[in-house]
């Protein structure tokens, strides 16, 4: 319940700060970051977090600073805001943030004094060793006729709030301090006696789980947070020029003040947007939206270039799809014209010329003692017209030269 009240108060304070303020000096910004405990090495926020019932409730209950709270609710916008702080301030937003090279944010929703005040108060109440005064007699259970002077001593004990109701602040390490006091016993039989007593001194603390005994006997019905941020029950109002109705804050807001909430006409199912779009992420060094995964123009390979809007590698010559010529088609994978011609078996395809060519030719057939047949792309041998029936001993008839030749000249007849 306290968390809901805090969120309502935070939203009211943020809405009250919609009037853009002056630019703060870099020194002031640096001091603010230091107060919030920001570091240059920011952990990766990952994808836009889904606002689903129990998961959201657990995250909200476990946050321990303004930085963590904003990172849970508005991960990308908050990262962009801190990036702008490190760059020396913020700028007025561009209404079309995804198309510009540099995403500019408005300062209206981020009143530094309010956030700093909340975070300072938050840090003061964290679970940690705190200097307290303890009653010596009660600490050790002294007899009623014995007391100490001074009656109290100063030691450190764990105290503060845990960020979840199921936890309590407990000490994880303890040291002991020796204190010298006067011990007085009545009736007085002797004067005050100096005594040295050791007191437990907590040196480190941690929020730890409570025992579940009571919860097993008495179930506590708690009202859960809604699965999504509450929508306004009232109908959308007609807002003046340059103002847009906001379903979450239930009022008209200036367009330039939209920083936590996206344009109503472009709401997604969960009501939140990635500030850089689905294919981009924030580069915290340059405060610009860049393609995810470190995709650069050099990553696309030959014949391709990087489309900075879609963050995809596209063909450089895609505008010339119809210039491939006959029997060629444009291949989207290689970004080149490839031959798609079908050739007969005896005329294999020449990919370079995209033509069906014969494997045999006149010269090849001549070397085989044959003639070239253009229609069939094959070599053939014309029959001998003067074939001799008998050759002299040691000679054999050659079908290639149509005469008798020495037998050892004759090659095996391949055909």
From Swiss-Prot:
- Disulfide bonding pattern of the chain: 127-169, 158-205, 162-207
Q: Which GO terms describe its cellular component?
A: extracellular space; membrane
Glycosylated sites = 171, 201, 236
- Matches recorded under CDD domains: PDGF (cd00135)
Q: Does the keyword Cytoplasm apply?
A: no
Per the UniProt entry, the propeptide covers 32-107, 224-415
* GO BP annotations listed: angiogenesis; animal organ morphogenesis; cell population proliferation; cellular response to leukemia inhibitory factor; glial cell proliferation; induction of positive chemotaxis; morphogenesis of embryonic epithelium; negative regulation of blood pressure
Cellular location(s): Secreted
Job description of the protein: Growth factor active in angiogenesis, and endothelial cell growth, stimulating their proliferation and migration and also has effects on the permeability of blood vessels. May function in angiogenesis of the venous and lymphatic vascular systems during embryogenesis, and also in the maintenance of differentiated lymphatic endothelium in adults. Binds and activates KDR/VEGFR2 and FLT4/VEGFR3 receptors.
Name by which UniProt lists this protein: Vascular endothelial growth factor C
């Amino acid at each position: 319940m306290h968390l809901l009240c805090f969120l309502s108060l935070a939203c009211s304070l943020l809405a009250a700060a919609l009037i853009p303020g002056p630019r703060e000096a870099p020194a002031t910004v640096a001091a603010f970051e230091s107060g919030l405990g920001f570091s240059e090495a920011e952990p990766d926020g990952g994808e836009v977090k889904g606002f689903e019932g129990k998961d959201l409730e657990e995250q909200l209950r476990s946050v321990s600073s303004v930085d963590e709270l904003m990172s849970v609710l508005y991960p990308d916008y908050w990262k962009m805001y801190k990036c702008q702080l490190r760059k020396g301030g913020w700028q007025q937003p561009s209404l079309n943030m995804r198309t510009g090279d540099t995403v500019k944010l408005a300062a209206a929703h981020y009143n530094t004094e309010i956030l700093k005040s909340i975070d300072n108060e938050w840090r003061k109440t964290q679970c940690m060793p705190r200097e307290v005064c303890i009653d010596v007699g009660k600490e050790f259970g002294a007899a009623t006729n014995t007391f100490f002077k001074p009656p109290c001593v100063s030691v450190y004990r764990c105290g503060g709030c845990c960020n979840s109701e199921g936890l309590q602040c407990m000490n994880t390490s303890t040291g002991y301090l020796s204190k010298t006091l006067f011990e007085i016993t009545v009736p007085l039989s002797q004067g005050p006696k100096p005594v040295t007593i050791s007191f437990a001194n907590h040196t480190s603390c941690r929020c730890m789980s409570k025992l579940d005994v009571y919860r097993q006997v008495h179930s506590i019905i708690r009202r859960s947070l809604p699965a999504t941020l509450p929508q306004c029950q009232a109908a959308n109002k007609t807002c003046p020029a340059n103002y847009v109705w906001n379903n979450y804050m239930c009022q008209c807001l200036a367009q330039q003040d939209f920083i936590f909430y996206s344009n109503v006409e472009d709401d997604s199912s969960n009501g939140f947007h990635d500030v850089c779009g689905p294919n981009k992420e924030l580069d915290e060094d340059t405060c610009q939206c860049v393609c995810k995964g470190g995709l650069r123009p050099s990553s696309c390979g030959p014949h391709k270039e990087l489309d900075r809007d879609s963050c995809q590698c596209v063909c450089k010559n895609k505008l010339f799809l119809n210039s491939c010529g006959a029997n060629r088609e444009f291949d989207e994978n290689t970004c080149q014209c490839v031959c798609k011609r079908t050739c007969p078996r005896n005329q294999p395809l020449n990919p370079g010329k995209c033509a069906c060519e014969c494997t045999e030719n006149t010269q090849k057939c001549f070397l085989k003692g044959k003639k070239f047949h253009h229609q069939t792309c094959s070599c053939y041998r014309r029959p001998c017209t003067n074939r001799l029936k008998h050759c002299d001993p040691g000679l054999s008839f050659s079908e290639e030269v149509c005469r008798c030749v020495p037998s050892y000249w004759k090659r095996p007849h391949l055909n």
